[in-house]
From Swiss-Prot:
This is Mating hormone A-factor 2. Pfam families: MFA1_2. Residues 1-23, 36-38 form a propeptide. It is a lipid-anchor. It is found in: Cell membrane. Residues 1-12 have a biased composition (Polar residues). GO terms for biological process: pheromone-dependent signal transduction involved in conjugation with cellular fusion. It comes from Saccharomyces cerevisiae (strain ATCC 204508 / S288c). The gene is MFA2. GO terms for molecular function: mating pheromone activity.
């Protein structure tokens, strides 16, 4: 699994809207941004 920092960085670069999805990652759900967006 990729570290949360890397996932958050990639998500931010892809879309600012993904910041909301980062909240789920911060909660403890280690989901990849791509999976969440999909």
């Amino acid at each position: 699994m990729q570290p949360i920092t890397t996932a958050s960085t990639q998500a931010t670069q892809k879309d600012k809207s993904s910041e909301k999805k980062d909240n789920y990652i911060i909660k403890g759900l280690f989901w990849d941004p791509a999976c969440v967006i999909a």
